[in-house]
Amino acid sequence: MEVERDQHISPPSLMAKTIPIIDLSNLDEELVAHAVVKGSEEWGIFHVVNHGIPMDLIQRLKDVGTQFFELPETEKKAVAKQDGSKDFEGYTTNLKYVKGEVWTENLFHRIWPPTCINFDYWPKNPPQYREVIEEYTKETKKLSERILGYLSEGLGLPSEALIQGLGGESTEYVMRINNYPPDPKPDLTLGVPEHTDIIGITIIITNEVPGLQIFKDDHWLDVHYIPSSITVNIGDQIMAEQWKVQECVA
């Protein structure tokens, strides 16, 4: 869902606040669950450290993404979204000067469950792409379910409640790799429009390049890069479930 954006300058009192950083290695799981719920309710986004996904795998994920976008346009278009398709899968690009448009290219495809995967949209180059994505899928699925478990417990629900509510083993996981190349005419194009994620949760692998922002207390705040961390964004589906639980408790 998109919302109207107004670039207010954040006051010092708000700029001093930072997005929560949650250490998943903490042995006090009740404390972790509380932190996940608090971060979700107050911010809708948080960083996790000691998350269990190997850093070398994250680097390989970044590498295959970079290598794909460096391919000639003809090779990238081999996995392009089909003209007229109502589905989202495939390579898309908008690297042209149209005022108000986003300067970006993306690769979007399903990674879970296996019955939903269409390998026609998985690049054959770089050659290690499939191996890396399949390995990352296993790890990100475990992390997602772990976070959903903490969130369920923190809301006073059985640990499997949100996982099952989102579909259990049938829940669709989607990979989106974004590339925002330097724009020589930034006044003619925009970044990604303001929006909320309609899904359950988004696991975001970031890098040193700034740009990600959140809207809090009527101001836009930068989401700073934290080395070795993963950023978790809570989507509309989970937010709706949180409100339902709170209303029932009230």
UniProtKB/Swiss-Prot annotation:
The keyword Signal does not apply. One of its GO terms (molecular function) is metal ion binding. Fe cation binds at residues 195, 197. This is Putative inactive flavonol synthase 2. Keywords: Iron, Metal-binding. Residues 171-250 form the Fe2OG dioxygenase domain. Pfam families: 2OG-FeII_Oxy (PF03171), DIOX_N (PF14226). Belongs to the iron/ascorbate-dependent oxidoreductase family. One of its GO terms (biological process) is flavonoid biosynthetic process. InterPro entries: DIOX_N, IPNS-like_FE2OG_OXY, IPNS-like_sf, Oxoglu/Fe-dep_dioxygenase_dom, Plant_2OG-oxidoreductases.
